[in-house]
UniProtKB/Swiss-Prot annotation:
HAMAP family named in the record: UPF0227 (MF_01047)
NCBIfam families: PRK04940.1
Pfam families, alphabetized: UPF0227
Protein name per its UniProtKB record: UPF0227 protein ECA1814
InterPro entries the UniProt entry points to: AB_hydrolase_fold, UPF0227, UPF0227/Esterase_YqiA
Family of this protein: Belongs to the UPF0227 family.
Amino acid sequence: MIIYLHGFDSTSPGNHEKVLQLQFIDEDVRLISYSTLHPRHDMQHLLKQVDKMIQHSDDDRSLICGVGLGGFWAERVGFLCDIRQVIVNPNLFPQENMSGKIDRPEEYLDIATKCVANFREKNRDRCMVMLSRQDEMLDSQRSAQTLGEYYEIVWDDIQTHKFKSISPHLQRIKAFKTLG
């Protein structure tokens, strides 16, 4: 099972396209929708939904995949639910760049600092990061510096922030998922 978390633009047709692409490596791909506007509520909702999906799945190597803001959530929720994560152009600092787009961007900082102390150290090698060199929204180098000590970084030279095509990376994602 692969759980897919969309980014801030939840209505983008690219979400459906990525779900279809992920179905090439696992036919059971489930999209969880969340508000994107209320971080604390989103955290509770995502934890509850992901836990329920894991409990009702017979796949002992489930994976959570998130793009952009979904990457912020996938890393944390995947860690808390003990499943591997693939995060694509993750928005690691939404409290800095979501101001004016959501009600309480400062809640992201609160969530980030209250997760689990040193959670990335405890999550070492259980997350794969895909970054685009052409990301027009986020600073990919900053993301690489923040995450590179803990996780494998996969660079893409073609895709933009929304990472429309993950197809060239499907075999790598599949291999990462099978590690359980």
